[in-house]
A protein has these predicted regions:
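Pol beta-like nucleotidyltransferase catalytic core
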Residues: 1-55, 59, 63-148, 158-283
Length: 283
């Protein structure tokens, strides 16, 4: 019977999308293990003969990539965006993280936005644990140097300082509603690692001013975005923006929108992979 071990996503999110295989002898491990002892690991691995490991977060957080490389034999397949794991593990397969927390009806509404205006939006957030977090704070602290219209937030009204999390995922829609441009900064900068930070921009017909995935051009059309490496470069590029820069990128914006629909559907992509695995192996 299907087993789900997930450190971040609610296991029900997997269960709800995998009803077709709920009776199959498969265990799914998502960004696992974090803080598990050896006995707990062995017990979880032994529940089913087919074990699938999905890695979404960077190795810097919990060392899960190191664990995957050292223990790849425990898994039938490892799904990851990391070229390091793919190069060092025979059973690793490329599986970009992507994802989105935007509502389907909101994404549909934003397919043809009618109220976009010339401004740059940005949500700094409260975290300070990664290089991308530091860059967000540095840029926010220098926001007065930005000379074009902006809509900058440190945190949103739904942010709970006690837990460090936002309580209403839909509250972020205010970031995308009207802005032509959005500053999107990932937590870390790695090949293959991109998240809702940039996917949400593409889904809302917003041009991302982007720091993060080193090879993002493998997944999206780079002509539909603006990349930077440092705070100074970001401020310089932002201050040189015009409304024309948005309209000139519309062709590539449409292309990236369609690509983003694919990468946003994390659970759908995984469901398709799992169904193929079941069919090919006659599970």
């Amino acid at each position: 019977m299907l087993e789900i071990f997930s450190n971040f996503h609610d296991p029900k999110l997997f269960e709800n999308s995998l009803t077709d295989v709920k009776e199959k002898p498969i265990s799914v491990f998502y960004d696992w293990p974090c803080g598990w002892n050896q006995n707990e690991i062995e017990n979880a691995i032994s529940k089913n003969p087919h074990n699938i490991l999905i890695l979404g977060e960077p190795n810097e957080y919990f060392g899960t990539h190191d664990f995957a490389i050292q223990n790849s034999r425990l898994f039938s397949v490892i799904l990851t965006w990391s070229d390091d794991i793919i190069n060092r593990s025979d059973n690793a397969v490329l599986f970009p993280f992507g994802t989105t927390w935007l509502r389907d009806d909101y994404i549909s509404k934003m397919e043809n936005p009618t109220d976009k205006k010339f401004e740059v939006s940005f949500l700094r957030g409260a975290k300070k644990k990664a290089p991308g977090h530091d860059l967000r704070w540095d840029l926010y602290d220098d926001r007065n140097r930005v000379q074009v219209p902006t809509k900058f937030f440190d945190v949103l009204d739904d942010f709970d300082p006690n837990t460090g999390f936002h309580t209403d995922l839909y509250a972020k829609e205010i970031v995308w509603n009207e802005s032509m441009f959005h500053i999107a900064i990932e937590n870390h900068s790695h090949n293959g690692y991109f998240t809702e930070k940039v996917v949400d921009a593409f889904l809302t017909k917003t041009i991302p001013i982007y720091w993060g995935c080193k090879d993002i051009d493998k997944y999206f059309d780079e002509k539909g975005m603006i990349r930077f490496e440092t705070k100074e470069e970001a401020i310089s590029k932002i201050n040189n923006l015009t409304e024309k820069d948005y309209h000139d990128r519309k062709e590539y914006m449409e292309k990236n929108y369609k690509l983003a629909l694919h990468y946003a559907n994390f659970f759908g992509r995984f469901k398709n992979f799992l169904n193929d695995l079941v069919t090919i192996n006659k599970l």
